Amino acid sequence: MDEGKMRKLLVIEAVLDPVADKLLRQPSQPVKTIDGVVREVAEFLEYQMTLQHGGRGASGFAAVQFGEPIRLIIFQWDTLTNRVLINPEVVSEKDSVTKIEECFSIPDHVFIVARPKMVKCRGLNLNGETVTVKGRDKMARLLKHEIDHLDGILIDQIAERRLY
């Protein structure tokens, strides 16, 4: 990673910073062109996934969580691979399951959240190609959580309740 070119992005913790909270609760802007800035943000998120893998166990991030309100997410596809989705949208969802959920943007809180058991999403990869991702169970929850971030929705808004 070229540290000289890397944008200075920081994890935004909504509950601690009113400016960050406002940014996180607004819809992110669609990516119009996959340019150097978009690639840089994706690279930064990839780096953050590497850093967090052994820590709090991040399985995904949305660009807006690092101060970039663009429609881009990264998520752990399997134990060795991260995937980037640009302008992702949920095209279908099925069933629902209620489970415990946490969020990096609202640290030290745990919520009970209902999410679809299965989702199908469509977006672009970094080459600008349309890709479809199907997720069930944990992957469905993760995809919906990250896409909610892009829509300005945090788990405290949709939770059935907060545990702590």
Please tell me what each predicted stretch does:
Residues 1-164:
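Positively charged
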